[in-house]
Every structure is written in structure tokens, then in C-alpha cells.
Amino acid sequence: MADDWESAADSEVVIRPTAAASVNKWEGEDEDEDIKDSWEDEEEKKDEEKPTKTEAPAKPKPNKALKAKLEQQARLEEEAEAQRVASLSPAEKLAEKLRLQKIQEASDLKHAQEAFGVTSTCGGLDAFNPESKEEFKEFGATLSWKVAQFRESEHFPQFVEDLVRSLCVNLSAADIKKVKMNVEILHSEKLKLEKANAKKPAGKGKGKVTLRTENDDIDGYQKYGNDFTEDYDDFM
């Protein structure tokens, strides 16, 4: 009987299949999204790293009409100036020549000041502070050049005489003697030159004889008036 029960119990045992592990159908979806996002980020970075092409500004085309107009205006001004000069009287032409000469002298003075380091026109000669022998030569050359601009005045000879006297007051007797000797030598040379020029017949095409001093080499910027300023360079 006991064997029958055991057999019946064994026959009633049912072996059920093991339940399959639950599978999440959304599993791995997040990973796909992460991969997709990383691709998009890389694409954005590549787009940012690409150099942006800047278009070069278009070069302005030359205005041919304006250029031609300016050239025509300049040509008309030159023609008008030529006609004006041609219509001047001899006296007016001389005055015009003197005016242009003064302009040139002013330009030469400006270049001389720049060469000597005098950049401020307000300071003028006061801007000089000579200490060495060469600096005093430069100062004297500039001073004599400036003074010589007034050589056409009838008061110029008296002015020079007074200037020399006032300068010599500050010298010793020995130094004044040296100045006197230089002036006498200069006076003698001037007499010889004046006599030589007076004896030469006019119209021979030879230039006037002038006195040359060492300052002509030192002060090459003096385009005008060397024959006047050299009279005073040796003792100024």
C-alpha cells in the first residue's frame, strides 16, 4: 500500500518550465541616445572649428572722373599763375622775386633748425644751449643767418656796428684785439674784391668775385646771403 502511495505521488509531480528572465524591451535605448548625442556633439565641435571665411572688402575703384577734374584744375591754376606773372611790370616782377626768395629763406631756416635739433619754432634761438666749440659754431651760423635776412634795410650797417660793440663789451682786451685784427683783415680783403669787380668790364659773362670763408663749408644750408654773412662769421 505504501508503495502505491509513493507511485501516485510521483505521478502527480509536474515539472514546470523555468520562467524566462523578464526582458525589458526598452533596455539599451538610453545607450543609443547617448551615442547619438555624442555624435551630434562631435559634429557641432567640427562646425565650430571650421574657420569662418571673411570676405575681403572690395577695393574702391579709382574715380577717373575726379582724378581728371583735379588734374584739369591744377593745370588751369598753373596757366593762370603764368599769365599773372607775365602781366607784371618790371617792378612787380622784382617784388615777386623778393617774395619768393623770402619764402625760400624761411624754408632754409626751418631745415637748418631741424638739422641742429631746434624743433620748436616758439623757442627760436633761445632753444640753443651751446657748450662745445662745434655747438657755438652752429649757434653762430644760425644767428648770423637770421640777422642777414635784414641786410636790405638801410639800418642794417648801423645795427651790425652796435651789435659788435655790445658783444665786445663782454670780452677781455686781448680778445677784443683778436676781433679787431679779424675785422681789419676782412676789411682789406673786401677792398681788394670791390676794386677787382669795379675793374672788370660788364657783359663778359664772369660772375662777381666773392669772399669765401670756412663757414661756407660748415653751413651748406645757407643758400642765400653767404657773401653778406661771411663778413661777420669770423668774429660772431
Swiss-Prot record:
The alphabetical list of record keywords is: Cytoplasm, Initiation factor, Protein biosynthesis
Subcellular localization, as worded in the UniProt entry: Cytoplasm
Q: Which GO terms describe its cellular component?
A: eukaryotic 43S preinitiation complex; eukaryotic 48S preinitiation complex; eukaryotic translation initiation factor 3 complex
Q: Where is the composition biased (Basic and acidic residues)?
A: 47-58, 68-77
- GO biological processes: formation of cytoplasmic translation initiation complex; regulation of translational initiation
Q: Name one GO molecular function term.
A: translation initiation factor activity
Q: Where is this region: Disordered?
A: 1-88
Q: Which residues cross the membrane?
A: none
InterPro entries of this UniProt entry? Answer: eIF3-like_dom_sf, eIF3j
Q: Where is the composition biased (Acidic residues)?
A: 28-46
The domain of life for this entry's organism is: Eukaryota
Question: Does the keyword Cytoplasm feature in the UniProt annotation?
Answer: yes
Q: Name one Pfam family in it.
A: eIF3_subunit
Q: What does this protein do?
A: Component of the eukaryotic translation initiation factor 3 (eIF-3) complex, which is involved in protein synthesis of a specialized repertoire of mRNAs and, together with other initiation factors, stimulates binding of mRNA and methionyl-tRNAi to the 40S ribosome. The eIF-3 complex specifically targets and initiates translation of a subset of mRNAs involved in cell proliferation.
Q: Which PANTHER family match?
A: EUKARYOTIC TRANSLATION INITIATION FACTOR 3 SUBUNIT J (PTHR21681:SF0)
How this chain assembles, per its entry, is: Component of the eukaryotic translation initiation factor 3 (eIF-3) complex. The eIF-3 complex interacts with pix.
Q: Which family does it belong to?
A: Belongs to the eIF-3 subunit J family.
Name recorded for this polypeptide? Eukaryotic translation initiation factor 3 subunit J
What is the source species? Drosophila erecta (Fruit fly)
